[in-house]
Amino acid sequence: MQMRVNINNSQYVKGITLMKNIFNHLHTEEILTRIDKLNPNSQPQWGRMDVAQMLAHCSAFQDIAMGNSFPPRGWLGRLIGRFVKPILYNDKPIPRDMSTIPTILITEKKEFDTEREKLKQKIIVFQNDGPEKCTTHSHPFFGKLSSEEWGKGIYKHLDHHLKQFGV
């Protein structure tokens, strides 16, 4: 009998920590359920984005992972990206107020219902397509990622922003 205990973004199985991954159907369902708990009046516990902007930001991140958007790598990412890459897929929380890729920083007003549905559909498509259809293009800051790193990173990114809004 295996004992499973949830620890932050991970599962603990007999001494092995397994990071949650958006390619796992149960982890995707958990994220979608949490997104459904948001409402237009959800307030951030940190950061400057409102809830609709956060949903649009997460959707823009999905576009990168799906190979629909190709932001250029900046000099800082080229310099230190590969060294800090584990931030994306280790079991430690993403630091609050960590700076983001400028091309997915959302400052204009967005419509909540539209952004929520758009993000949910992108997550579903990404999960259904599976790791084999994940982009082979580099992340604009962290550089080359395997599909497993993308899957863990997407889960962790979504989890970070959902916690930002209390769900």
Residue ranges and their predicted role:
Residues 43, 119-126, 133-135:
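Conserved, structured core segments of small domains
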Residues 43-89, 136-167:
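Short, contiguous alpha-helical
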Residues 18, 68-110, 114:
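Alpha-helical membrane-targeting segments
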Residues 21, 42-43, 105-110, 146-147:
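Active-site rim elements
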